[in-house]
Amino acid sequence: MDMSSKEVLMESPPDYSAGPRSQFRIPCCPVHLKRLLIVVVVVVLVVVVIVGALLMGLHMSQKHTEMVLEMSIGAPETQKRLAPSERADTIATFSIGSTGIVVYDYQRLLTAYKPAPGTYCYIMKMAPESIPSLEAFARKLQNFRAKPSTPTSKLGQEEGHDTGSESDSSGRDLAFLGLAVSTLCGELPLYYI
């Protein structure tokens, strides 16, 4: 046997790789674009994880709120009373800056306004064919405030209400106003405009 053939077998095998093994190579891309690509991928992954966590938290808090509401309602008669008001298309609520809240009840054709201090509540009957806009309601409210006060009468006695009438707050039944308007106005004096 030849001594030179043994030396050839003991040498390390040749390296056939195109570049160093420690570098990630994308053909036709400079180094600064590779770094930018890695940063963008990392940022997108972080954003996806954060959005996923926020959506899971929102879902959990919604389920908790629904569970608490179901436990607080509890009684079947309360559920029957609240069932018609669950339709979202019958009531619209608007916050007018810091001045107050307006509630449109399309099922009962009522519009209610409660100013921010919460000392009284204005209620206006709507016609089914002409529902007033927020601007029209605000103008009518300003006209009502500019008028001198008129004699008071009970709200809801008949269809022919007196404009500017205030209801008596002692022992009144606000069921005809509906849940949304009754909740908004509570025990405040009611003015029909």
From Swiss-Prot:
PROSITE patterns to which the protein is assigned, alphabetical: BRICHOS, SURFACT_PALMITOYL
**Cystine bridges:** 121-185
Q: Which domain of life is it from?
A: Eukaryota
Q: Where is the segment annotated Disordered?
A: 147-170
| Record Pfam families | BRICHOS, SP_C-Propep
Q: Domain BRICHOS, which positions?
A: 94-193
Query: Which positions anchor the lipid (S-palmitoyl cysteine)?
Result: 28-29
Q: Where is this protein localized, as stated in its record?
A: Secreted, Extracellular space, Surface film
Biological process (GO) annotations held by this record are: respiratory gaseous exchange by respiratory system
User: Which UniProt keywords are given for this protein, alphabetically ordered?
Assistant: Disulfide bond, Gaseous exchange, Lipoprotein, Palmitate, Secreted, Surface film
Coiled coil feature spans: none
Gene Ontology cellular-component annotations: cytoplasm; extracellular region
Q: Pro-peptide positions?
A: 1-23, 59-193
Write down the InterPro entries for this protein, in alphabetical order.
Answer: BRICHOS_dom, SP-C, SP-C_palmitoylation_site, Surfactant_protein_propep
The UniProt record's further free-text remark is: Pulmonary surfactant consists of 90% lipid and 10% protein. There are 4 surfactant-associated proteins: 2 collagenous, carbohydrate-binding glycoproteins (SP-A and SP-D) and 2 small hydrophobic proteins (SP-B and SP-C).
Q: What does this protein do?
A: Pulmonary surfactant associated proteins promote alveolar stability by lowering the surface tension at the air-liquid interface in the peripheral air spaces.
Q: What is this protein called?
A: Surfactant protein C
- Annotated gene: Sftpc
